Amino acid sequence: MAVKQTAGREALGKFAPKFAELNDDVLFGQGWSREDKLSLRDRSIVTVVALMAQGLTDSSFQYHLTTAKNNGVTKTEIAEILTHAAFYAGWPKAWAAFRMAKEVWAEDDAADAKAKHHSIPQIWEQIPPEPLCLPFV
């Protein structure tokens, strides 16, 4: 379910109230809420590719990468999406997009490394709590 957007009003409400209203209520409110037509995950993918194609790798691009991640796009998928889009949008734009995507998905790498470290059994966990006693026959 789409989250109610207020960033436009918070950033530009007094300076450009109509733009803020269109941003929050129309673009995000109406456009992103039509999940019966296109899922949030798919909208995120389309948005990331559209921004990359324009060469917009600013805070809005980072926001949409994070949104894509939160909407279920995996690191493997974003890498494939950006690689595929690079052939149509341009290699330099893809490089810029990858730099930001790498940052957004970096915490996954850290969590994976931590989980891997904790999944390796420690030597003392393999030692039985009491010594084995075999009966004499």
Model regions and ranges:
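Short, structured motif recognition centered on aromatic/hydrophobic residues
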Residues: 42-51, 61, 65, 81-82
